[in-house]
């Protein structure tokens, strides 16, 4: 699958206090409804829970460009309601919000257009090391339903890979890259969002 050079990837790490995951996802569901109706420039809007912490929400978002993310998506009323809740006096976050900017290196989002499912095995792995080595050694997995390699726009030494197997029982581990460190996170689709626009 090819992606336009302007495609902007946004990884969101939203770590809520105990019991906040449901409220955060409820607000994101309302944003998702708006995205589907009014944002053709939003190509992926996918939210999952951390497998070990249901109040840790992981987001994978793809936009036509960073400009439409900042000037259109983030200015919509449903998104502003969500953002205002995160910064409200209610203080729902256990840790500061992390928003990471990436570009696509290679890969595919939903090989057979099956759509996401809570039974999928999904692994998000960040690799830190020599940029040239990571670019050369990280490869797309043609057997995976999702295999997306992305490169940080903020830190040249940071790459990440999203791998998903659709209800197959396969549980892949991170790639072994010489001289690089890796941190992996298993996530479970929350029922909110999409990989490819329906």
Swiss-Prot record:
At the top level, the lineage of the source is: Eukaryota
Domain (ABM): residue spans on this chain: 8-102
- Any one Gene Ontology cellular component term annotated for this protein: nucleus
Q: Which GO terms describe its molecular function?
A: oxidoreductase activity
| PANTHER family recorded | BIOSYNTHESIS MONOOXYGENASE, PUTATIVE (AFU_ORTHOLOGUE AFUA_1G12025)-RELATED
Name of the protein: Uncharacterized protein C21B10.08c
